[in-house]
Amino acid sequence: YRPYHLRSIGEYSLSKVSLDDRDLPRPMKDGNRVKAYYAYDVVSGAVVGYAYNRYKTTELFLDCMRNMFQTLDRNGMYIPAELEVEHHLVSDFADGLMQAGTVFPLIRWCNPGNSREKRAEHKNREKKYGVEKRTQVGIGRWYAKLEANRPKEEKVYDEKNNTYKVKTYSYEELVADDIRAIETFNAQPHPNQKRYPGMSRWDVLCAHQNPNLAPWDKAVLYRFIGQHTETTIRQNTYCTVMYNQYGLPSPEIIEKLEPRNYKVDAYYLPDADGTINEVYIYQNGRYIATCKPVARYNENTAEQTEYDKAAYTEQSKYVAQFDKMMKDGKIKRVGILAKEEAKLITEVQAEAVPLPAQAEEEDYSAYMDISAFEHDAVAKI
């Protein structure tokens, strides 16, 4: 047997998150299997991110990352210090999202074909032969050494003598069952009860976070994993994303835009319920601003609530700031150039301007020969 490394698990959660993909063991009605991608916290063992797809593509990995950061954001957690991944599905992001220091401080690329190395491989087995085997039908491997780990199969006695009845499920059923299994898995007692008495995997994740973790910059992160759309700044005030308006934080942001160019790229990540709380806008790869939803107010004064009054005040402040910038000349009004002036400008011919000749550098090579100085110094002794 080839020697392998002996390691110990750390002390703090989110110090390292290990990711891996797998096929759910039970087949769909077309005979194929659902592709799943998990993110496990190494210390607590809890699943902090998951995603499903009918196909094993890079979008499966991105969906898992989105789900993980939604979980971290929802629970007020900081960015993991290290990610452990394999080259499969992830290598396309090696120069961006998966480059150490861009989003995550550390990235661990596992060696291909070495399943011992990746912690998520062990967690997949622990989840499959633990909670899944107890709560789902048909979990196991027909060639498993232990009979308890073999699925129960009903044989069909025909001329082939190799036919078995296999129950199939819909895609939605398999995904729902696996999400329930994840919730049960996270709620189970932590395997090391001597170290974490009475605590579940999720309890350890929340209570023992690494104190050196840093908050994450959504403006940078969402550019890699967020949803993207092209939009336009309207009325020097807002942009529209998914049929909703998101306002600029200040009229001064307009100065960051290129002249006469109001087209921007918007990046965002909806919550679990589909709500978009923030939109991060870029122009030609340069960050411009973070936009929040524009609060509309009821124009019927008799029906206005405190919310409507606050929304009216907020919009009025923005307009007042814009008017002040116009008055101060920071934003120029659009003017019309006279035809004569425009014609003169277009007829101007570019002329080459001669550059003054550069003076030759002085020759200091004579000063580099120190033998003459040594001779004079000796003569004076």
Regions found by a protein language model. Name each.
Residues 1-38, 46, 59-64, 71, ...:
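Mobile-element integrase/transposase regions
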Residues 41-42, 282:
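Short, acidic, Ser/Thr-enriched surface-loop or helix-capping motifs
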Residues 42, 52-57:
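A short acidic/small-residue loop/turn micro-motif
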Residues 45-46, 286:
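Residue-level signal for well-ordered, solvent-exposed loop/turn and beta-edge residues enriched
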Residues 63-86, 312-318:
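Short, solvent-exposed cationic patches
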Residues 77-82, 87-215:
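Globin-like tetrapyrrole-binding proteins
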Residues 169-330:
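C-terminal, beta-rich DNA-binding module of retroviral/retroelements integrases
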Residues 289-381:
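Extended, compositionally biased alpha-helical segments that mediate assembly or anchoring
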